Structure formats: C-alpha cells, structure tokens
C-alpha cells in the first residue's frame, strides 16, 4: 500500500448516488481504498453522460457500465470488464395497468421512456419482434412521477428502485423483464481501459480487490451503508428508499450463492451471441481482450511455470545422461 502512496483515481458511476453503488462507499468508509494506497473520487453521473467516454478518455480511471460495454468494444473503444456486481440485470420495463398494457407487445403505440445505454431493453424488443419505431418514444425524465401521473404509459427502470415510489402511490403496474425472453444479462459492470490496465496493472488489481471487499461489507451491513449514503452522499431519497433498494438487490447480486464480482467467459459469450443474433454485434465477435480474469490467468501462469520447471528438469536430466 505504501508503494502506491495514495494515488488519486476516479470511479465514474453510471447514475446518481444510491445503494446501487454501495460497495464503493463501503470501501471508502472502511478504509479499504486507503489500505490499497488509493484516494478514490466517486463521481456521480448525470443524464446523458457517456461513462465509457469518461474512462477511455482518461477523465476517469474506472467506471460502472452496462452490457453495452461489449458494443463499445466493437466500436473500437478499448474497455476491459473487471468485475460483475449484478449477476442478473435490474433493467426492466414498468407499465401502467390503466394504460391497457398486458403484455410486452402492447407497448406498440404507447408513450414509452427508454433510458440511454439500455441496450438489453432494445434487444428485448428485437427478440420479441417489436419495431422500436412503432413505440411513441419520449425522452426519459427519470422521474417515476410521470408514470404515476399518466404522462407516459411505460418507463424503463431498475427493478430495485422505481417500484418504491410506485408502491407508495398505490399505482397498479406490470413489470416486463428481458429474462422472460431468455435475455439474462449481467448488470453494473466495473470496468477500466486497456491503457489503464496496461500502464498500471497493480493499481487496477488493488482497486478491484478493495472495491469487491467493500461490496461484501455493504451486503453484510445494508442498514449501516444505507444510512451512510443518506447522510454523506445523497438525501434526494428518504432512508427507507435506500433500505428498499438494498433488499431488492439481494436476489440480483446473489451474494449467498456467488462470489461478488464473479464473471464467466461463457456467460459473456452468451451475451455476445444474443446481441449477434439480433444484429447488434457481428457473429463470432472476439472479446478475449475485453475480460479481466485474474484468477484464471494466475492458474494459467502457475501451470506454465510448472511446465517450464518440468521441462527444465527434463532437459537437465537429458544433458546429465548424455554426459555419462
């Protein structure tokens, strides 16, 4: 830690402060970043901010992104996925029952707000053969009140967030999840740039480990971290909102079953194939440099080291025998 000497870095969040980013607040509050030699700025996002651009341009060393990182990679933006927080993406469509929306196909002709960067929701429509141009697209206000007031019929949302206010308003609503169409994507992926990883591999490793340690703490102490968020980062919502968000996140993160941060090449392959199947990625898209899999690489390095040692001994034995 001392060798890193409190290096300043920025983590660009993908949205406003909330329990959605609890692990990073916990890592800061518990001193995990400090112990890793890092001084971390947690930068809140605003609507329309391109998180990938912030990271690739070097304005931020790290970011939180969607599965659209794969599409960014195809576009030539050299992003590297470091860890997955949500094993199941929280992105859904929420529709007013009063707007006569009974199935996903009823979105045709309805007033729909879809947020930027929600590629999997667009993929959901394509999978269901619903042309996006047949929706009455409305710019997203990011206010569930617009759905409550009937200004729109459908909104894209995080299943862990907006329903808090819809329930409080006693609104009858339906939730449509891409998982019903076989689109079971990751959510809120921690990432960096190839440039950052290439120049500062130890810093990347230290930041990742401290962040995931923070996430484990946050999921074990949700009340404490919800109170921290409300007191230090954002009082935009009542404390009960952050506690609600924490509860809703448990089945999406699955900390009881899966190590926080875990991601598999096979699952990313499935995501890439899903995008390819609907024309959002080319078939056979090579994303090998997109994944940061330190545990697997460590095992491969150990195997190679063992193989080299074995071969060296073998050669030495052959030389010895030949000299006899």
Segments the model singles out, each with a brief description of its role:
Residues 38-41, 55-65, 77-79, 110-113, ...:
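Alpha-to-beta junction loops
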Residues 68, 124, 140-235:
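Pocket-lining segment of extracytoplasmic ligand-binding domains
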Residues 22, 31, 53, 57, ...:
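Solvent-exposed, polar/charged alpha-helical surfaces in well-ordered, non-transmembrane soluble domains
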Residues 199-278:
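Secondary-structure end/capping motifs
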Residues 39-47, 61-62, 132-142, 175-178:
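Short beta-strand-to-loop elements that line the ligand-binding cleft
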Residues 44-48, 58-70, 75, 85-86, ...:
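Beta->alpha turn/N-cap motifs
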Residues 6-30, 89-169, 182-187, 269:
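Bilobed "Venus flytrap"/periplasmic-binding protein-like clamshell domains
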Residues 1-41, 250-324:
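N-terminal hydrophobic or amphipathic helices and topogenic motifs
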């Amino acid at each position: 830690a001392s060798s890193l000497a409190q290096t300043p870095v920025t983590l660009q969040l993908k949205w406003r402060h909330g329990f959605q980013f609890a692990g990073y607040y916990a890592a800061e509050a518990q001193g995990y970043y400090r112990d890793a030699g890092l001084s971390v700025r947690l930068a809140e996002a605003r609507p329309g901010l391109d998180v990938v651009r912030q990271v690739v341009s070097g304005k931020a060393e790290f970011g939180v992104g969607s599965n659209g990182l794969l599409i960014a990679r195809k576009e030539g933006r050299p992003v590297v996925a470091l860890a997955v927080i949500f094993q199941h993406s929280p992105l859904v469509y929420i529709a007013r029952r009063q707007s006569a929306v009974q199935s996903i196909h009823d979105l045709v002709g309805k007033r729909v707000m879809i947020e930027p960067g929600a590629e999997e929701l667009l993929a959901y429509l394509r999978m269901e053969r619903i042309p996006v141009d047949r929706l009455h697209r409305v710019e997203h206000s990011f206010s569930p009140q617009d759905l409550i007031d009937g200004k729109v019929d459908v909104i894209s949302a995080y299943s862990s967030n907006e329903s808090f206010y819809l329930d409080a308003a006693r609104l009858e609503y339906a939730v449509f999840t891409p998982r019903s169409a076989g689109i079971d994507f990751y959510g809120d992926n921690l990432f960096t740039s190839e440039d950052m990883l290439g120049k500062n591999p130890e810093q990347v490793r230290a930041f990742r480990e401290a962040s995931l340690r923070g996430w484990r703490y946050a999921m074990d102490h949700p009340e404490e971290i919800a109170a921290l968020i409300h007191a230090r980062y954002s009082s935009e919502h009542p404390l009960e909102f952050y506690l609600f968000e924490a509860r809703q996140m448990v089945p999406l993160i699955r900390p009881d079953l899966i190590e926080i941060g875990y991601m598999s090449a096979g699952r990313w392959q499935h995501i890439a194939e899903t995008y390819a199947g609907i024309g959002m990625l080319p078939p056979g898209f090579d994303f090998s440099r997109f994944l940061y899999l330190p545990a697997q690489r460590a095992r491969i390095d150990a195997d190679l080291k063992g193989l080299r040692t074995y071969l060296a001994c073998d050669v030495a034995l052959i030389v010895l025998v030949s000299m006899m």
